[in-house]
Structures are given as C-alpha cells and as structure tokens.
C-alpha cells in the first residue's frame, strides 16, 4: 500500500537542492513519479508494512491551514488469522483440482436433464431446454483474473431450429447437476 505526505511548496523549496527547481521526484513502489512543485501541496507516496499487517498514513501541511495533520489506519493480523491463511492454502489446492476436472469437460457434448426454460433467445418467447443437446463452451470461475463463486459455472452452447429462421445459436449457464455428459 502507498501512503501520501502533503508538503507545501515553500517547505520543498527550502529543503531541496537548487538544481531541481521545477520538479520533485519521489520514489514509490510502482516506480518513480514526477510531481510539479508549483501546486499548493505535494503528495509523496511511501509504503509502510510489518510482518502482521499494513499501515496507511497521510501527513499533510497546507498553505491555508498551518496546522499539520497525521492520519493513520492500520490493518493488523493476529497470529490465529496468519495460521488460518496457511490452512486455506491446502484447501485452495483442493479447489484447483476440482477446477481442473471441470475444465476437462470443456468441449464435451451434454444433454439437459431437468426442466428449464430460457427467455433470452431473440424473437422466441421461451425455449424449453429439457432434453436438448449442446456443447460446454466455458467453465466460468475467473473474472478479470480473480476467482469468483459462480452459481451457474458452465457456459453451454445450444443450436435450435426455428421455423422461418433456420438454426439459431444461443448460450445458457448451467449447474453441473442440470446436465449429463453424452459419450462421443
């Protein structure tokens, strides 16, 4: 985490060497950042962390209000929560095994075994899925690189013949117990 210190340009001018009149360069975790010193205050990001948590602090001095303020929020982990995090790593490996088994099903042919209706097929009021066959296109457990708990993790593609339109392709998300795998 990064923290910010706000310093007035007068303080910066008194402290910095004369060769750097235009910009103050501050190092941060994400790299180096140039900050214009002509603004009313300057924020210099820093990082504070301990073995049990992270601290987020802000120190500010402004021209309008000469009083300085320091504000800190600290997130601290107890020893029990550190142990719990270690236990979660073993359960995470079990989840990845389940995910790998489910991802092996991608591309498999399936048949819907429960009575389901969908209402999102264009120009068709409703479509009954019971007994329809389709293909598993995706197993949705990651969104933008983060693990999510999807209620309907299997994305299944169906093709239905509609009178006057020909075959219409649509997708539906299903649970694992709502379909059965068909042997090729």
Curated annotation (Swiss-Prot):
Its main location: plastid. InterPro entries: Elect_transpt_acc-like_dom_sf (IPR008990), Fd_thioredoxin_Rdtase_alpha (IPR004207), FTRV (IPR044166). PANTHER family: FERREDOXIN-THIOREDOXIN REDUCTASE SUBUNIT A2, CHLOROPLASTIC (PTHR46937:SF6), FERREDOXIN-THIOREDOXIN REDUCTASE, VARIABLE CHAIN (PTHR46937). The keyword Transit peptide applies. One of its GO terms (molecular function) is oxidoreductase activity. The lineage of its organism: Eukaryota, Viridiplantae, Streptophyta, Embryophyta, Tracheophyta. The gene is FTRA2. Heterodimer of subunit A (variable subunit) and subunit B (catalytic subunit). Heterodimeric FTR forms a complex with ferredoxin and thioredoxin. This is Ferredoxin-thioredoxin reductase subunit A2, chloroplastic. Belongs to the ferredoxin thioredoxin reductase alpha subunit family. Residues 1-71 form a transit peptide. The keyword Transit peptide applies. Variable subunit of the ferredoxin-thioredoxin reductase (FTR), which catalyzes the two-electron reduction of thioredoxins by the electrons provided by reduced ferredoxin.
């Amino acid at each position: 985490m990064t923290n910010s210190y706000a310093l007035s340009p007068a303080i910066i001018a008194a402290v910095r060497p004369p060769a750097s009149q235009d910009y103050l360069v501050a190092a941060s975790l994400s790299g180096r950042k140039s900050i214009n010193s002509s603004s009313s205050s300057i924020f210099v990001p820093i990082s504070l962390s301990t073995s049990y948590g992270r601290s987020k602090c802000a120190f500010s001095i402004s021209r309008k209000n000469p009083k300085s303020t320091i504000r800190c929020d600290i997130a601290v982990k107890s020893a029990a929560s550190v142990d719990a995090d270690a236990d979660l790593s073993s359960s995470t490996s079990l989840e990845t095994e389940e995910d790998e088994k489910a991802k092996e099903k991608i591309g498999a042919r399936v048949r819907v075994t429960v009575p389901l209706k969908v209402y999102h097929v264009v120009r068709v009021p409703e479509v009954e899925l019971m007994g329809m066959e389709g293909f598993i296109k995706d197993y949705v457990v990651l969104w933008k690189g983060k693990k999510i708990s999807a209620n309907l993790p299997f994305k299944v593609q169906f093709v239905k013949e509609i009178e006057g339109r020909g075959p219409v392709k649509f997708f539906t998300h299903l649970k694992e117990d709502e379909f059965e795998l068909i042997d090729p």
